[in-house]
């Protein structure tokens, strides 16, 4: 009996050992499978990092390509990927403007109404700003409906603020591509961003607003039509006459700069009151051949209503960066289970905003608490492990870095075009005074640049890499809060004063 019992024990021990080995083998297999799935997610991120790399030599080629496109755009209409639109602005505010003027600033799914009171010596005595969201149906309805809504908002604003409107100057910032026919008129070339009112294309947008103002009983007319970059340039120049360009990096991106009239070949012979004219670059449509589109850029372009239009803008501006990140996270979820099994939240387009992306990148807490909160609240991904949160933050960093460095290259292209980058593209002597290199000021506006510190750091870092420390030290990026609308009011005041002087 004892021998038989001992045999049973030995059999049981062997069975237990076999079972334990099987369990251990299963655990090893599961760990191995989990490691494989994790490595797949990491591979997605590494591939993104390689495709989004922007070393200094690559950025310099982007600079050169954009500068060439700018030359071509100044030579002929339709000869370039960037439109290089003439703005008819040949004089900028100089600080002598006085009085009250109004402005409307339309550039996205909301607009601003402003009342600006100016005093002598570059003094803004008072500025009132009111933000007004635009209902989605008006972005796809009729031009009459849209401009009636804007005019009605201006009327209500004026009534609340009080004061006379008779003869008051009105600036209109309209941040969509327009072919300017005079300082106060221009025809819409096409819509960008969320707008698609097709019957408005080809219409004079200032006239559309004037008619809406009349329908609303307002005895005032647009006397200056500009886009947001020109408004920002005007405010920058109002404070500092070393301001040579303006850049918008917000929901969209674009730039303008002061150009010599003799460099604008397509308009030689045009009668102007100055030797220089502000040119609207429209660089959002630039497509740098040196920059490879990632699978996520391609997927995103295929899903948007404007397809492959505005390719440069889609890699830089605030409307799009969060969506690119979402597509990357979706791919990571397809390749692995790092977000768990319930990942339906990743399928909703634009559910992740660029402010969310910025908050993810700027979360410096040890456990990346804010990253986890955003993943749970916006993408419906609860209890994401810390190592996965780190991978999410890395994706946000890659997308941010590419955007900021491309924006820096575009800024340098303008500096190169006007000879402020230390090259022979223009006469660098223009920017010297008594042998000392003068400052070059670029006015800048937009929530992405103003509100995202890491973006600013990467942009400034790239400027130094491209320009070199000596030249970069002479370039100042100056933020202009409410620049586009305030600048339009300043220009309206400046041109109103000029007309009064000419009529006297």
Curated annotation (Swiss-Prot):
One of its GO terms (molecular function) is glucokinase activity. GO terms for cellular component: chloroplast outer membrane; cytosol; mitochondrion. Residues 94-226 are annotated as: Hexokinase small subdomain. It is found in: Plastid, Chloroplast outer membrane. Expressed specifically in stamen. SUPFAM superfamilies: Actin-like ATPase domain. It comes from the Eukaryota. Residues 39-493 form the Hexokinase domain. The chain crosses the membrane at residues 7-29. Fructose and glucose phosphorylating enzyme. This is Hexokinase-10. The gene is HXK10.
């Amino acid at each position: 009996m004892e021998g038989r019992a001992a045999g049973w024990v030995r059999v049981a021990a062997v069975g237990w050992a076999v079972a334990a080995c099987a369990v251990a083998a299963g655990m090893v297999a599961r760990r191995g499978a989990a490691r494989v799935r994790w490595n797949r997610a990491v591979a997605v991120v590494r591939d993104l990092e390689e495709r989004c790399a922007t070393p200094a030599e690559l950025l310099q080629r982007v600079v050169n390509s954009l500068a060439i496109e700018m030359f071509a755009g100044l030579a002929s209409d339709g000869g370039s990927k960037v439109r290089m639109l003439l703005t008819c602005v040949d004089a900028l505010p100089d600080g002598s403007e006085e009085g009250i003027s109004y402005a409307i600033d339309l550039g996205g799914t909301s607009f601003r109404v402003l009342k600006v009171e100016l005093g002598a010596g570059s003094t803004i005595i008072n500025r009132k700003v009111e933000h007004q969201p635009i209902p989605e149906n008006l972005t796809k309805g009729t031009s009459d409906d849209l401009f009636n809504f804007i005019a009605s908002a201006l009327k209500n604003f004026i009534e609340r603020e009080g004061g006379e409107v008779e003869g008051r100057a009105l600036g209109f910032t309209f941040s969509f591509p327009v072919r300017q026919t005079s300082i106060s008129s221009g025809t819409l070339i096409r819509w960008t961003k969320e707008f698609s009112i097709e019957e408005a294309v080809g219409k004079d947008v200032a006239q559309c607003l004037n008619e809406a103002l009349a329908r609303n009983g307002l005895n005032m007319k647009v006397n200056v039509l500009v886009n947001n970059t020109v408004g920002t340039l005007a405010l920058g120049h109002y404070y500092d006459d070393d301001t040579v360009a303006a850049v918008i990096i917000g929901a969209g991106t674009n730039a303008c700069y002061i150009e010599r009239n003799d460099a604008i070949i397509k308009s030689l012979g045009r009668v102007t009151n100055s030797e220089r004219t502000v040119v609207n670059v429209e660089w959002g449509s630039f497509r740098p051949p040196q920059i490879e589109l990632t699978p996520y850029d391609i997927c995103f372009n295929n899903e948007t209503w404007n397809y492959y239009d505005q390719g440069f803008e889609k890699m830089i501006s605030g409307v799009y960066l969060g969506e690119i990140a979402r597509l990357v996270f979706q791919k990571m979820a397809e390749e692995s289970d790092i977000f768990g099994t319930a990942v339906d939240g990743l399928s909703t387009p634009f559910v992740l905003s660029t402010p969310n992306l910025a908050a993810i990148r700027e979360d410096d807490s040890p456990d990346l608490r804010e990253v986890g909160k955003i993943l749970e609240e916006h993408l419906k991904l609860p209890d994401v492990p810390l190592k996965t949160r780190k991978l999410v933050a890395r994706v946000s960093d890659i997308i941010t870095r590419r955007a900021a460095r491309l924006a820096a290259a575009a800024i340098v292209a303008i500096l190169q075009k006007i000879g402020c980058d230390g090259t022979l593209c223009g006469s660098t002597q223009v920017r010297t005074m008594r042998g000392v290199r003068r400052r070059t000021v670029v006015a800048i506006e937009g929530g992405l640049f103003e509100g995202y510190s890491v973006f600013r750091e990467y942009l400034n870092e790239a400027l130094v890499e491209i320009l070199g420390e000596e030249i970069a030290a002479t370039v100042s990026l100056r933020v202009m809060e409410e620049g586009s609308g305030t600048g339009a009011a300043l220009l309206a005041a400046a041109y109103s004063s000029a007309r009064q002087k000419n009529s006297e």
